[in-house]
Design a protein with these regions (language model features):
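Membrane-embedded hairpin module used as a gating/binding unit in multi-pass transport
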Residues: 7-13
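A beta-strand-loop signature enriched in Asp, Gly, Thr, and Trp
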Residues: 15-85
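Short, small-residue-biased leader/transition segments that mark boundaries at the very start
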Residues: 1-6
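CBM-like carbohydrate-recognition segments
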Residues: 55-153
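Generic signal for short, ordered secondary-structure residues
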Residues: 13, 45, 114-118
């Protein structure tokens, strides 16, 4: 989940900076594979190949990064394709905003259930600051789109 989310958002940024259509095409291909592998609530497992799925830890940080990237990616594509990615981002943000993933008053953070570095047993099922950063970024991007602006402010 986490490594694939970085590639997904990375190719969107490369396309933004270069306007080379091969990066936009690749971003879509990576994104389509990513979206097809998500569980029902659209919050990824820490690793899509974990043999313990569906009991593997979820990674809210990866979900937040991808939701933000999907909103940007949606603006570079025709309405049909772009809408699919925007809708997927909204589904992810809806799950991330639910009681299942929000810390409420229990921690000084927004999101629960992120994974920092599973192989090193570091930050497993934790609140991670960059998860909150990308979650807020995604919410702001969605708000800007809903108000008729671009995602980049």
């Amino acid at each position: 989940g986490s490594e694939m989310c970085i590639r997904d958002s990375g190719y969107t940024v490369v396309y933004r900076e270069t306007k080379d259509p091969k990066y936009l095409d690749f971003a879509q291909k990576v994104t389509d594979v990513y979206l097809d592998r998500l569980p029902e609530d659209k919050v990824p497992y820490w690793d899509f190949d974990d043999p313990s799925i569906p009991n593997a830890p979820r990674d809210a940080s990866a979900g937040a990064v991808v939701a933000s990237a999907l909103l940007e990616l949606s603006t570079y594509l025709p309405n049909g394709t772009g809408k699919r990615y925007k809708d997927a981002a909204i589904e992810m943000l809806t799950s991330l905003s639910s009681d299942s993933y929000q810390s409420g008053e229990s921690k000084p953070s927004f999101l629960l259930h992120s994974v920092g570095h599973w192989p090193n047993h570091s930050e497993i099922d934790a609140s991670i600051i960059y998860a909150d950063y990308y979650y807020i970024e995604a919410l702001l991007r969605l708000k800007r789109l809903q108000e008729g602006y671009g995602v980049l402010g």
